[in-house]
Curated annotation (Swiss-Prot):
InterPro entries: DCAF8, WD40/YVTN_repeat-like_dom_sf, WD40_repeat_dom_sf, WD40_rpt. The modification Phosphoserine is found at residues 21-22, 99, 129-130. The lineage of its organism: Eukaryota, Metazoa, Chordata, Craniata, Vertebrata. It comes from Pongo abelii. This is DDB1- and CUL4-associated factor 8. Belongs to the WD repeat DCAF8 family. Pfam families: WD40. Residues 100-112 have a biased composition (Acidic residues).
Amino acid sequence: MSSKGSSTDGRTDLANGSLSSSPEEMSGAEEGRETSSGIEVEASDLSLSLTGDDGGPNRTSTESRGTDTESSGEDKDSDSMEDTGHYSINDENRVHDRSEEEEEEEEEEEEEQPRRRVQRKRANRDQDSSDDERALEDWVSSETSALPRPRWQALPALRERELGSSARFVYEACGARVFVQRFRLQHGLEGHTGCVNTLHFNQRGTWLASGSDDLKVVVWDWVRRQPVLDFESGHKSNVFQAKFLPNSGDSTLAMRARDGQVRVAELSATQCCKNTKRVAQHKGASHKLALEPDSPCTFLSAGEDAVVFTIDLRQDRPASKLVVTKEKEKKVGLYTIYVNPANTHQFAVGGRDQFVRIYDQRKIDENENNGVLKKFCPHHLVNGESKANITCLVYSHDGTELLASYNDEDIYLFNSSHSDGAQYVKRYKGHRNNATVKGVNFYGPKSEFVVSGSDCGHIFLWEKSSCQIIQFMEGDKGGVVNCLEPHPHLPVLATSGLDHDVKIWAPTAEASTELTGLKDVIKKNKRERDEDSLHRTDLFDSHMLWFLMHHLRQRRHHRRWREPGVGATDADSDESPSSSDTSDEEEGPDRVQCMPS
């Protein structure tokens, strides 16, 4: 009894906040509480055996009772055995249920994980797409923002002309934004059966020469919409350029083509072509020639063989090699060449790399910097992996500026007087230059505007000073506008592309043209350019295209020689200092990447 009471008292004192383990220290009042404490202990033991609750103070009292006497320990042990059985059954059920629940949760988690990953990817993709769309919107808005106030206004200019204080009304009007914004298609000139690759006005602006894939050259009276004459060029492949030589009385046309030949046509006063003769031969396609502004006898020619010829029609052997364009020891095929109108000793070339190269004919030393006077390139393209090509470049009217159009890139304006390696000064965006050798040009008597075609079939005109798009016209149903030729004196523009006609544009609209759909076209061009930069497949396409063209040229060549009486006429009039007619078959597959049609 004392042992039991002792243990009970220990529990009771613990409940009261004090701990006493000596029975001699208990008072009479404490002995009176012993009976009630024992009842509470038995009740708590009974509750413990029924509920299986072993936590809290009950667990502490049970442990203390087990250390006092064996008799009480046996009673407790019998209760504990019952409790142990009760616990083990519940625990097994709980463990079993818990394991099944965990397995189900794991299975659900495994099924849910791919779904969550897909949702996360979709959310990230949507977020990236929305970010890209927002960035594209911001970019388009910056390219189509409000224009500054025009410098030339029609009513004040007319009033000044009436008062006799403006002697240059037409000159200034041709360079006015208000006229460019009123451009509208006047008519088409139809006479070719292939893509039209080249256009050129004579000095007076009365005639317009055009060359085509049909191997013909047509000289137009563009006002009356009638051909003055048309003739076979003598070329064996796509005619890329045909230009009137200045101060020649419109009697001499210089031509070049994919076959690499440089030919000259002599026109008679009776509106016929007397003959054409070959004066030079490139080992590859020849896209452009460069006229000297006042010379009726001399011009320059550049080809994909990296060679620049100077041609003087007064010489027995007209062509002489001027320079071979190289980057370090590697040849750089050329697509374009232009003579500085203010300093005809200097000329610029561009081609199958990212550099605009300027040469001075008096100082070409190929042992020193490969003969280059200076080079320009947008700094972000110098060491880039974009493989940018220059498809066209032109000098401004006074030679102070140089405009270059890059394949699958933008158009850049350089100051030609800047030092070697200088950065561009202006950049013109929005068009697409990928499918062909795209032309670019200045428009206006003072080169106030920049004009370019695009793969989307539109013509873009930018104000040079602000870089803003001020005119946007659908120029080709076939999808690509290649050639843009401003009239030398009037506010007129001639364009051509994959369509088989020449289009004449003039400022005859009653109001400024609404730039309807411009933002959508710019977005589409930007997306296509970005996609092509990520997924370039043009290498395979170029190899296939080169193979097919090479095969067709061979078949056509053999067919001509099998026909009776064919084969000697061209050779009789050829005067070439260079390689044979078959050099066009030496073009590599990468030379076809920028073909004009």
